[in-house]
Swiss-Prot record:
The gene is gcvH. Binds 1 lipoyl cofactor covalently. Pfam families: GCV_H (PF01597). GO terms for cellular component: cytosol; glycine cleavage complex. The lineage of its organism: Bacteria, Pseudomonadati, Pseudomonadota, Gammaproteobacteria, Enterobacterales. The glycine cleavage system is composed of four proteins: P, T, L and H. The glycine cleavage system catalyzes the degradation of glycine. The H protein shuttles the methylamine group of glycine from the P protein to the T protein. It comes from Shigella dysenteriae serotype 1 (strain Sd197). Residues 24-106 form the Lipoyl-binding domain. The modification N6-lipoyllysine is found at K65. This is Glycine cleavage system H protein. Gene3D superfamilies: 2.40.50.100.
Amino acid sequence: MSNVPAELKYSKEHEWLRKEADGTYTVGITEHAQELLGDMVFVDLPEVGATVSAGDDCAVAESVKAASDIYAPVSGEIVAVNDVLSDSPELVNSEPYAGGWIFKIKASDESELESLLDATAYEALLEDE
């Protein structure tokens, strides 16, 4: 079973979301998602300043197996991207919940967080796959 940290929120598309002290949210893909994709070779990051809606594809993770869209779990403005991934996309594999984060977003409607899954619900989703 994949590692599913209890303090994070999750989307059904296998993104995770963590609230930061400054009120922004850090987004990445889950350990389960990176295991399915395999070794990352490139991450196409969103533009800082871009406004996205929940469910919009805003980044792409390319692995040796496939390219997979990464979706915004909530609506808002992209306020930072993990530029380190340009040279080290393998961090998505080795540190999916730490150094392998993809982008940070300032949520425009925090009520959208209610539609995300907690760790228990995400684990149940994985068991059904």
